[in-house]
Every structure is written in structure tokens, then in C-alpha cells.
């Protein structure tokens, strides 16, 4: 509602009237000089909408004043792990057997008597038949050729002109180790040398970077891995010492050493062999032979010391006169030992190669005292039992057959390999393989009629006597410049592998073809016939 005032003339006393109006409100009535009364009027409502809101629009925003949720975690301080294992096998299912009463014993006996003669006759025919000779089931891929898998070397040793003098495979067949030294003329007693090993099963194998390297103060001439400890290896030095290393210890690999005492060899050590202690198949001793004529047995005691437990001496006057022997070129009474091989059938029986060229059959059980004045902390005994016909020069290597108790091979400077029977002095056969020296010969661990020889002309010769007894089946060229091959070893665990070391300081690992790794039919019988025919 709006109030509207009617206009009218104001009197001179207008100001007083206004005051009266303000005080009283409405005049009692119109009159001259008085204003008209105030009246109420109802007018229409006018609305003006907001244009600003339409332009700006309405915006909504959602805000949160609550903090993020609190992260919690639960942990058990005394949790228990439970593992269930069942060790009891399932109860065996009883085999259903018919009661004995259901068998007709008399009729069964009559049937067996009736067919016995016919079955025996057929079995005899099958036994004498050769229909399936040569039949074999081949579960692996056939390897047709001999190939070189690895060419290994140690550049610092090769830079010094050192030769690979010995090779050995460890008990697992995965690691091959070599000794560096010199086998030619000269005084190498003060020359620093090395023992190196490569793990062929490593994916990151580096042929010129051995897995283990041991620096040795004197030239190493021979090496042999422990039969059961894969990282233990024994070595013989030019100085006459025998040492044992643990190749898994990179900082200080030396385990034991003989030291330079009265018991130590006075000449270079030719070969070392691990032997089980009598009565302790899990404990081993180290046997060493040298050109001073002594055969010594060492046992590791305490920390770092090899102690002499048994000793033998080869004296010319005590050798059995089984054959005519040449006089020792220097007129000495001691006979220098150059190689040794133990029988696979008698752990006390061994063959020695000598500087005089004649092999000796010896025994660790010998009790006769040696007629020598060489100093020793233990009594020295004379081990020789039998003397065989000699080579034309010193023997460098001998190897006993793993398949026949009486057969062994020898190789020497005359370039011949002799096959001997322990039952007679003359060799069963003599093969001239080279016009130069033969430094090593080894019998195959899987083929009774196969052996390998290393020559001074840089080759490795593989012989299969079942095919030919006069020429090698395979000739492997180890060195292109005909540098001598000084050593070789079959791998008894991975029988397809053969390692050979040469004068260039290189070790080559050869993969043999299938014909050298799988035994043929009647091969063992043929070896028996070879020994029996000539020895008869």
C-alpha cells in the first residue's frame, strides 16, 4: 500500500501546522489555511528482476574440509610357519593271488617237463646267434666328427713362453685345469708359473680369462684334481715340492705344501696322484714320483703342512732281472721315475715309467728295505716286482687299462706306444706313431680298444684297435706350427670331451665323435682275446 498526499496551499502558519501535524497526526477537519487530509491508496506492485544473476549464472562448487583417511597396517610379531610333510608312503595295494588250491600242481609239472627240452634248445640257439650283433639303441644325437669346442689360454703365461705341462679334469667333469711350466732345456727353477682353471659350464665363459688363477714360485710340471673334492688340486714343482690348492679360495688358495726338507724330492716332480687311505675310503693321500728315484706318500696335517707317511726308492741293484737292462747313462744307483699309473683292479699295484725306458710293476705293499742312503724321516722300501722290456729312450707316460687287469700302455721318446701285459716282459704290440717324442698316452674311459697319444709333432692321435692296430683312426691337428703337444686327458664324466695342452700355452677341448664314446658289441671280449692270444 502507498500513501499519497493531496497538494494544497499552505498558510502563513504552515510551519506551525506542520509541527502540529507531526505531533497530532491528522487534522480534525478541513478548513481554510489547513492542509487536506492524508489518504491511503492501493497501487500495483512493480517488480524488477535481477539481470546480474542471469548474466553471471549460478555456479556450484563442492568443497571438503575432512582430512584424508588414516592408513593403518597390521603386523604379527610372533607369527608361526607351518609346513606339512608326508613321509609315510601309501599303503601297498595287496596283490591278488589265487588260492593255491586252484592250481593243478600235477598238470603244471607235467607241462614244464614236456616243454623243458624245447625251451633249452631255443635258448642255446639264441645265445650262439649273431643276428643282433652291432644293434644299439641310440638315445642321443650322433656326433660324426671330432670338433674343437674351446681354445683356452692365459695370456700372461703365454707371454712368458710357458708351456702347458699337465691337464686335469675335476670330479664333476665341468672344470679343466692346466699347469704352466717348461719341458725343454734350461734352468727354470726360479721362473714364476701359474695354475689356471676354467669352468666350462659357466654361461659367461671367457676362453682367455680363467675362472681361477694361482701364481706359483716355481714351474709346475704335473697336476691332479682330488677324486671327490671338486676344487682341490695337487701339483708337483720343478723345485721338488708338492703343493695342494683349493681353487675356491681366491685370496689364499694354498692348503698344504711339503716345504724344502730332507723328505722333499731333490729333482723335479714328474707326476702326482691321489690315493685313498687304507681303511678310509673318504680320506686321500698324495703320491708323488720324481727323477730322484723316490716314490713318496704325503698326508695333509694341521694347517698348511704335508707330512711324509710312506716312502719308496728305486735302486738299480734291487730291480728284478726280468729282462736285459741297459746301464743307467750316468752310472747312478737310483732309477729316475718319470710317470706312474695305478691299476683299476688292485689299488696297491702301479706301473712306473723310468728314465731308462723300462716300465716297472710295483706294489705299495712291498716290505723289502731299499738299499739307499738318501735321507728320509720314514724307512724307504723297494717297490719293484717286475721289469718289462724297454723302449728306445725314456718313458714319458704310462696308462693302465680300465677294462683289463693285466694290460697297460707306455709312450716314450722313441715315438712308440707299447701295449704290455703284466704277465710277460715283452710288449704285446709296438706301434710307431711318430718320428718325434710321444709325451702322453691315455686309455679311453669308455672304449676298451681306444686310446689317445700326444706327439711332439703337434698332433693328437686316436687309435681304435678294433679297426686297425697300425695306423690311427683319427689324427687331430692341435698346433698349426707343429709345436709339441705335451699332455692330454679324457673326461671320465663327460666322456665326449678330450683336453690337450701344447707348447704354445694353449688348452684345446675336443668333442669326440660318437664312434669314440659308445662301446661296440663284443669289444671287451676282443680285448680279452688280444691279451690271451699273445700271452699264451
UniProtKB/Swiss-Prot annotation:
Expressed in several cell lines (at protein level). GO terms for molecular function: dynein heavy chain binding; dynein light chain binding. WD repeats lie at residues 215-255, 264-308, 390-430, 433-473, 480-520. Residues 80-93 are annotated as: DYNLL2 binding. GO terms for cellular component: axoneme; centriole; centrosome; ciliary basal body; ciliary plasm; ciliary tip; cilium; cytoplasm. Transmembrane segments: none annotated. Keywords: Cell projection, Ciliopathy, Cytoplasm, Cytoskeleton, Disease variant, Phosphoprotein, Repeat, WD repeat. GO terms for biological process: cilium assembly; intraciliary retrograde transport; intraciliary transport. Belongs to the dynein light intermediate chain family. The cytoplasmic dynein 2 complex consists of two catalytic heavy chains (HCs) and a number of non-catalytic subunits presented by intermediate chains (ICs), light intermediate chains (LICs) and light chains (LCs). Among them, a heavy chain (DYNC2H1), two intermediate chains (DYNC2I2 and DYNC2I1), a light intermediate chain (DYNC2LI1), and a light chain (DYNLT2B) are unique to the cytoplasmic dynein complex 2, but a subset of the light chains are also shared by dynein-1 and dynein-2 complexes. Acts as one of several non-catalytic accessory components of the cytoplasmic dynein 2 complex (dynein-2 complex), a motor protein complex that drives the movement of cargos along microtubules within cilia and flagella in concert with the intraflagellar transport (IFT) system. DYNC2I2 plays a major role in retrograde ciliary protein trafficking and in ciliogenesis. Required also to maintain a functional transition zone. Acts as a negative regulator of the Toll-like and IL-1R receptor signaling pathways. Inhibits the MAP3K7-induced NF-kappa-B activation pathway. Inhibits MAP3K7 phosphorylation at 'Thr-184' and 'Thr-187' upon Il-1 beta stimulation. This is Cytoplasmic dynein 2 intermediate chain 2.
